[in-house]
Amino acid sequence: MAKVGIVMGSDSDMPIMSKAADILEKLGIDYEMKIISAHREPDVFFEYAKTAEEKGFKVIIAGAGMAAHLPGMCAAIFPMPAIGIPMHTTSLGGRDSLYSIVQMPSGIPVATVAINGGANAGLLAAKILATSDAELLAKLKAYSQELKEQVEVKDARLQEVGYKNY
């Protein structure tokens, strides 16, 4: 099966990036998770991005905060889809990260999820892979059905007890 790269600039991003890994694990998708700073160790980062294709990666999920160059640089070097996760920051609430990731120059696209959107990044990676994997597509459909059923259970409870006792 295809593999997904998960890369973050700092271990402080781990709580969010782990949500992407959790989704991939639930769906049976192999991944490799790394902490690499594009600013503090650019040589290590370039090697990672240049060798990702030969390692079997089909998608890279990159999370970053503040200047948030990691996702864009992955997209510039890695020839397949890059998904950016903007991290919440204390100074601007993650808007700085979001704008850095989403405002890419023409020809270097980064699929960008919500601020701290680790789970959706994992799901987007799975959906990309599922375009050529029928078994994975079936797992995604089952996952969507689980989400639907969770909402139905919550609504049934609301109807039974009312909003004041919910």
Where are these regions (language model features)?
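Glycine/charged-rich beta-loop-alpha catalytic/anionic-binding loops adjacent to active sites
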Residues: 2-3, 29-32, 80, 102-110
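Glycine-rich phosphate/diphosphate-binding loop of Rossmann-like nucleotide-binding domains
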Residues: 2-40
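C-terminal binding/interaction regions
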Residues: 8-15, 19, 95-166
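Short glycine/serine/threonine-rich phosphate/pyrophosphate-binding segments
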Residues: 13-17, 41-45, 64-73, 92-95, ...
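Acidic, glycine/proline-rich low-complexity segments that act as flexible tails and inter-domain linkers
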Residues: 31, 43, 66, 158-166
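N-terminal beta-loop-helix "entrance" segment that forms/cooperates
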Residues: 33-54
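Glycine-rich phosphate-binding loop
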Residues: 48-86
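Glycine/small-residue-rich loop that forms an oxyanion/phosphate-binding "nest" at active or ligand-binding sites
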Residues: 77-102, 106
